Amino acid sequence: MSTEPIAVSITGLRKSFGDKTVLDGVDLTIRRGEFVVLLGPSGTGKTTLLRLLTGLEVPDAGEVLVPGRRTTVYQEPRLIPSKRVLANVLVGLRRTRSNRAAGLAALAEVQLDGKADQWPATLSGGEAQRAALARALVREPELLLLDEPFAALDALTRLRMQDLVGDLVARHRPAVLMVTHDVDEAVRLADRVIVLDRGRFAVDTAITAPRPRERADPDILRYQTEFLAHLGVGGSDRRPIRSAS
């Protein structure tokens, strides 16, 4: 069991919209440096859970404890067109030499050296998403929330971004909760994968396969098959693999 401090603690979380219960008694703990991926069909409450962690939604019941420094990277980079790349990375921060240096260092970490003075419109989709990552990193988050951050990218760029995010998380050690529909992506990146179904966690599984993870590895295929079954794809034999502990 990890001895890292707990970054996220959720107990008995309930959230409804009108007559529809979206989250029904959810319990979740994420430790610092732990990469947790949330899978589930559309409309099962994945994004609602992220919004509760950011404070954009308020729970109807239960307790949500999160660190003060937290930030979100979305599917769309959300760069401000009228600000240059470095200014986008530093948006909302004080204009100091130290912050400028931190912004340039963050751009270097995401391999955007030399792009600081460019306009967002000149960036490719992958570069724009890397700028969004730099904007998150410069805030030194204790909790990093990723809302389908690679969904709009082509397959090759997506793989490169997965590798980059994995490296950055290993280096900076925030707690991470990522929402995705991509089972391959989940198994490739996660320390734990959770499947959300009808407002509850149907699966909470530790991924113990060594890194780097290859799709052809039998253990990886086993995890993928299990998660796909819980998502209603493939076979219907839903035997548990291994519970997170």
UniProtKB/Swiss-Prot annotation:
Could you tell me where this protein is found in the cell?
Answer: Cell membrane
Q: Where the protein is mainly located, per its record? A: membrane
Output the SUPFAM superfamilies linked to this UniProt entry.
Answer: P-loop containing nucleoside triphosphate hydrolases
Q: Which domain of life is it from?
A: Bacteria
Complex formation: The complex is composed of two ATP-binding proteins (SsuB), two transmembrane proteins (SsuC) and a solute-binding protein (SsuA).
Described by its record, this protein's role is as follows:
Part of the ABC transporter complex SsuABC involved in aliphatic sulfonates import. Responsible for energy coupling to the transport system.
Q: Which protein family is it in?
A: Belongs to the ABC transporter superfamily. Aliphatic sulfonates importer (TC 3.A.1.17.2) family.
Protein name, per record:
Aliphatic sulfonates import ATP-binding protein SsuB 1
Q: Which organism is it from?
A: Nocardia farcinica (strain IFM 10152)
Q: List the lineage, top down.
A: Bacteria, Bacillati, Actinomycetota, Actinomycetes, Mycobacteriales
